[in-house]
């Protein structure tokens, strides 16, 4: 079963990776809003009907930066407070596992977004055992409560401009191995407003679904629109 059709399987660990400045945080914030607003789809991908509560753990942006983004996103539109109350932002990450466990054990939560993995993981990123034991804490929460956890993470600088693939992820292969789905967001070579959303790993999709990117346009609201284009990854 998918929380977001084709992209994010329910009750699993997943990742959105890419170079800096591609709009990864914006994409995940937009997904969070789509869920809590009760939308039927996110960028054309069907959303599962469920309780629509989201926790967003933000290590890079504080309250000020988050509210700037929200104001930009909504523009002239008045945000619906009753819907927004279903999205909880967490800025203090001390004791985060214990706190997340407490919240999801007493509330129905669909999605936990970790933005970003590199800030929360304090071990050696190239040590598979350390990476695995860190991710297992989140995996246990996902398995126990059926909540989906999406990590925002970066790709290696050396992989810039290369064909999107899961070997470009920064750090140990242990990270990718724990993920059921890995999405990669890349910049278009010729149009700076375009991004390519690529499925570089998904245990539940045929290879044919992973061979082409979905072309997105980054708009003036710091959010994405889906275009009708798909482009071969190679």
Annotate each predicted stretch with a short phrase.
Residues 4, 19-20, 48-133, 137-140, ...:
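Conserved inter-motif catalytic segment of the P-loop NTP-binding fold
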Residues 27, 31:
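Hydrophobic positions on the alpha1 helix immediately C-terminal to the Walker A/P-loop
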Residues 34-51:
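Post-Walker A helix-loop "phosphate-sensing" segment adjacent to the P-loop in P-loop NTPases
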Residues 15-16, 21, 25-26, 129-222:
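Phosphate-binding/switch region of NTP-binding enzymes
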Residues 1-8, 41-44:
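Pre-Walker A adenine-sensing motif
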Residues 220-234:
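NTP-binding/hydrolysis catalytic cores, primarily Walker-type P-loop NTPases
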Residues 13-14, 54:
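Conserved beta-strand position immediately N-terminal to the Walker
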């Amino acid at each position: 079963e998918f929380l977001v059709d084709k992209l994010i399987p329910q009750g699993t660990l997943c990742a959105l990776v890419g170079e800096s400045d591609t709009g990864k945080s914006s994409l995940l914030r937009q997904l969070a809003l789509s869920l809590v607003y009760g939308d039927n789809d996110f960028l054309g991908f069907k959303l599962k009907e469920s309780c629509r509560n989201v926790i967003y753990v933000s290590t890079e942006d504080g309250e000020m930066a988050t509210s700037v983004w929200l104001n930009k996103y909504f523009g002239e539109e008045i945000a619906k407070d009753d819907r927004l109350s279903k999205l909880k932002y967490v800025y203090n990450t001390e004791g985060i596992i214990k706190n997340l466990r407490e919240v999801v054990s007493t509330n129905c939560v669909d999605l936990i977004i970790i933005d970003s993995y590199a800030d929360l993981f304090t071990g050696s990123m190239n040590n598979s055992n350390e990476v695995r034991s860190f991710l297992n804490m989140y995996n246990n929460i996902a398995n126990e409560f059926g909540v989906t956890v999406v990590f925002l993470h970066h790709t290696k600088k050396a992989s810039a401009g290369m064909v999107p693939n899961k070997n470009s992820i920064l750090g140990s292969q242990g990270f990718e191995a724990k993920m059921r789905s890995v999405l990669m967001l890349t910049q278009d070579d010729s149009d700076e407003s375009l991004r390519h959303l690529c499925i570089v790993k998904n245990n539940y999709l045929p290879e044919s679904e992973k061979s082409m990117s979905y072309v997105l346009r980054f708009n003036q609201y710091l959010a994405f629109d889906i275009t009708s284009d798909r482009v071969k990854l190679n």
